[in-house]
């Protein structure tokens, strides 16, 4: 369970961080190498989920989506300085509950 959480967090940071660098390059006129570095990081984002032990691609990516939402809220708060409101936190918590059910519900 700890390894799964670490891999989800690493994937999220790679996706958000890489995407953010591409955003800065294209939307905020940063140097082209922001985009290059962002693209390289996004390749790692594509690789990291394959290290998960769960057998189903769909389940891994669906569960990762919930983790991504939480990380995106935290990124917006920490990096973009946009304070999440109560509904952001409630929505993120609901997603985390969904991830937990999807990955660790007892199955036969």
UniProtKB/Swiss-Prot annotation:
The keyword Membrane applies. Signal peptide: none annotated. Its main location: membrane. One of its GO terms (cellular component) is plasma membrane. InterPro entries: UPF0060. It is found in: Cell membrane. NCBIfam families: PRK02237.1. It comes from Desulfitobacterium hafniense (strain Y51). Keywords: Cell membrane, Membrane, Transmembrane, Transmembrane helix. This is UPF0060 membrane protein DSY4157. The chain crosses the membrane at residues 6-26, 31-51, 60-80, 86-106. Belongs to the UPF0060 family. It is a multi-pass membrane protein. It comes from the Bacteria. It holds the Pfam family UPF0060.
């Amino acid at each position: 369970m700890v390894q799964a959480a670490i891999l989800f967090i690493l994937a999220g940071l790679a996706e958000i961080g890489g995407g953010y660098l591409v955003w800065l390059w294209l939307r905020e006129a940063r140097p082209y190498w922001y985009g290059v570095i962002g693209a390289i990081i996004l390749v790692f984002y594509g690789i990291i989920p394959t290290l998960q032990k769960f057998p189903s691609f769909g389940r891994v990516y669906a569960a990762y989506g919930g983790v991504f939402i939480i990380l995106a809220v935290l990124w917006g708060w920490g990096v973009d300085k946009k304070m999440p409101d109560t509904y952001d936190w409630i929505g993120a918590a609901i997603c985390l509950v969904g991830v937990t059910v999807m990955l660790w519900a007892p199955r036969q």
